[in-house]
Amino acid sequence: MPSASLIKEFEQLVGKENVFSSEADRQSYAYDAAVLKPMIPSLVVRPTEVEQLGQVVKRCYEEGIPMTVRGSGTNLTGGTIPDCSDTIVILTTGLNKILEINTEDLYATVQPGVITAKFAAAVAAKGLFYPPDPGSMSVSTIGGNVAESSGGLRGLKYGTTKDYVMGMEVFANTGDLVKTGSRTVKCATGYNIAPLLVGSEGTLAVTSKVTLKLIPPPKASKAMMALFKDMDGASQAVAGIIAAHVVPCTLEFLDHASINYIEDYVKIGLPRDAGAMLLIEVDGHPAQVEDEAVIVEKVLRDNSATEIVVARDAVEKRSEERRVGKECRSRWS
């Protein structure tokens, strides 16, 4: 446990309500979504201002105290589980402001505690699109997405978080502020540090600000579900779709075991006798979407799909994709 004087210092810095020292509070931050051995930290501190974050990091460094950075803790890698009982957990959920959405230059700047789904919705309200859609996006944070290089159903066509990070501001373990990247499409100035930080699970620096690329949204989309007797047919269908030069924005594969585990867990009406299932979505210009949907359906039938179901509308499409995709990853990731 940190000294009483250090705890008091943190309470004065971030407010007593943002320092958690009781055993019950600390136990809540001993684990994350990964099924790994928990470790109770010595203290949990939640800064609400960037300057506070830098000071907390600096004081931990000066006192020789290990740090673990945490957002919502939805990761499946154990990245937010403390390494030892002396660790102080630094919560970034208090830094949750969307600082800018630039509709002219197509970027946004946010703090690490911003919830992914709220950010995507704010961007959509401005007529733009932020594609990365991890299954936990309703509760995950942008900082956590960057730390894990998170991706989701749209990853095949649109990529993952790493493809949208333009720049970052982070605190080194000493508490020094480091700025990397820029808000321009082309930036060859200085070392390209941001790609090293993305996916580092908070082991290299503590994120205080992220600049993310935005794109125009697709004008139309169409989603479908295809069932197969076995995995071979589904695998061949995937290869056939790509070989036909169609890159779906969603292409999710479930084998027989996954289908049944998910159905046991959430009971959403998945066909238990199916050997494999594909969730597919194409998007883009309306004419392109119709053409690609026809090609995809033909490839599916040519590879012995036993059933093809096309979503009736956008609400049904996203609801089914999100439920199935989220449960698939949560059970098997």
Where are the predicted features?
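Noncatalytic alpha-helical scaffold of FAD-dependent oxidoreductases
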Residues: 1-326, 331
